[in-house]
Amino acid sequence: MGTTERESDPIAALILDRLSCTEYACSSLSRVNGGLMNFIYRGTLSRPLPDGATTVIVKHAEEYLSGIEGLSLSTYRSVIAAITLSFGYCVMDVESVQTNRYCVALDEVEVAVPRVYKFDAESNTQILEDITGYITVCEFLTSRCTQSTSPAFTTRLGFRLGSWLGGLHAWGEGRSPAEIIGGVEENQEAQDGSFDFFYGNPVRRVEQFPHLLGDCKEVLEQIRDRAAREQKSRTGEKFGFVHGDILSRKSVLIPGDSVTRDQHLRFVIIDWELSQYECHFRECGEVLGDLYLLKRFQDIDGAMSIIQGFLEGYPPLNEDAIFRTAIYLGLFLLANEVTLSTDYPKQQIEDFVILARDLVLAGWHKDRETLAKTVFGPVFFRAMN
């Protein structure tokens, strides 16, 4: 890296200097798109590692976010991610802890996480395995190859993702943070940020859409207050360890050639910085809402097939669990920044807000009839045990 390059990217220069005397010394770093919280680079190693790797992923944390100007966040998030990847969420004791890698075979699906080569606590830098040949679920759904993909395949993909996430939740249920990883309980900033997103944003949307949300402000506030009590006492229904950031556009990777060899599907789950203790149904609502955005605003039918499969693969939900999940799904949709977008017709945004409102109210009041009339009614009740 020359003088000009160092001046234009001082973070990369710092990383190169820190790694220069280690086995992870890099000849170059190239910025990887998609990082809002961290500075993410792909490093070309000066010498291959013993496992043959010639590149690594470098995640570096600062007290400010890389993609959001003016917003600060503790670098403790990098500690959470490193510990979680190395030890924490090992749902299954399958490989030696010395490899710093865990994976599991479940119904012809294998789930893995990147190997943590090194964590430099002093500089808040993680050196991770570079997962090559993989794409995000969102990239898969928006690619041309999806046009020739059957709904059965995308449903199976969702089923396997639901099975894995259900296994993660079941493993963490009833375990204290200390039993999983020593630091998850202290990830207070992540908890505060996600709490404000899920419960603060929907209340603020009332001011934006008073004609649509005015009558449900009290319900939104009651949901927020209940969540605050549950988070404080950690005694809410299905309250336990969650990944915290399962999004189709960033956290769930599948092989780029999955369509041609889908008999044995492999997931790689990344971005564990927001791991925390929360309601399992909230994480399910986030997964469903994130996928539905692809259907609603990009008209990607495969997203609904994944939703159906996810609910079929996740451990059976009773009626109360369906209602709780509907609440969190509606909250996620209301909280999402798309409600602030000017890129879509006003009526399209308002119809979206109405759907989110109906999901929240139907879930809160346990109104089966209203829930059944939404686009999620059929898939919810099909998944009910």
Curated annotation (Swiss-Prot):
Residues the entry annotates as binding ATP: N38, K59
Residues forming the catalytic site: D245
Catalytic activity entry: (1S,3S,6S,7S,8S,9S)-6-[(4-methoxyphenyl)methyl]-3-(methylamino)-5-azatricyclo[6.3.1.0(1,5)]dodecane-7,9-diol + ATP = (-)-FR901483 + ADP + 2 H(+)
Domain of life of the native organism: Eukaryota
Pathway: Secondary metabolite biosynthesis
Annotated EC: 2.7.1.-
Principal EC category: transferase
Keywords tagged on the record: ATP-binding, Kinase, Magnesium, Nucleotide-binding, Transferase
Function text: Phosphotransferase; part of the gene cluster that mediates the biosynthesis of the alkaloid (-)-FR901483, a potent immunosuppressant that shows efficacy in animal models and a probable inhibitor of purine nucleotide biosynthesis by targeting phosphoribosylpyrophosphate amidotransferase (PPAT). FrzJ catalyzes the last step of the pathway by phosphorylating the C4'-OH of dephospho-(-)-FR901483 to produce (-)-FR901483. The biosynthesis of (-)-FR901483 starts with the condensation of two L-tyrosines to yield (S,S)-dityrosyl-piperazine.
Similarity comment text for this entry: Belongs to the methylthioribose kinase family.
Assembly and oligomerization: Monomer.
Name under which the protein is recorded: Phosphotransferase FrzJ
Species of origin: Cladobotryum sp
Taxonomic path: Eukaryota, Fungi, Dikarya, Ascomycota, Pezizomycotina
Gene coding for it: FrzJ
